[in-house]
């Protein structure tokens, strides 16, 4: 086992991880529920950055809660899928390297 190659590989992985974090911060995902009455947006880090609620829901608290939960769960699932895909892309590139 060549430890110098392992160190080089580790540096490459760390550099790619930094690049992914920067890219994730700049990505935006949105999900709608209730035929678009509620829209939630999140960045690639999973931080909610915007919520839009149609005025017609303001007097129906229960429906608003249900639609918010649905939109939040959907957008967070999108973020998780994207993060997983990006991580697989990075780690997949190192699978064939012989140490």
UniProtKB/Swiss-Prot annotation:
Molecular function terms, GO-annotated: DNA binding
Family matches, as SUPFAM superfamilies: YbaB-like
Domain of life from the UniProt record: Bacteria
Taxonomic source organism: Campylobacter jejuni subsp. jejuni serotype O:2 (strain ATCC 700819 / NCTC 11168)
Entry keyword set: Cytoplasm, DNA-binding
Function: Binds to DNA and alters its conformation. May be involved in regulation of gene expression, nucleoid organization and DNA protection.
DNA-binding listed as a keyword: yes
Subunit structure: Homodimer.
GO CC terms, sorted: bacterial nucleoid; cytosol
Compartments, record wording: Cytoplasm, Nucleoid
Xref: Gene3D superfamilies: Nucleoid-associated protein YbaB-like domain
Protein name (Swiss-Prot/TrEMBL): Nucleoid-associated protein Cj1642
Family: Belongs to the YbaB/EbfC family.
UniProt xrefs under Pfam families: YbaB_DNA_bd (PF02575)
């Amino acid at each position: 086992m060549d430890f110098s190659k392992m160190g080089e590989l580790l540096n490459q992985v760390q550099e790619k991880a930094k690049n992914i974090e920067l890219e994730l911060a700049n990505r935006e995902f949105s999900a709608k529920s209730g035929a678009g009455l509620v829209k939630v947006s999140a960045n690639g880090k999973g931080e909610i950055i915007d919520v839009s609620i149609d005025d017609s829901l303001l007097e129906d608290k229960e429906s608003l809660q249900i639609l918010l939960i649905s939109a939040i769960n959907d957008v967070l699932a999108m973020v998780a899928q994207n993060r997983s895909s990006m991580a697989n892309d990075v780690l997949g590139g190192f699978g064939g390297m012989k140490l």
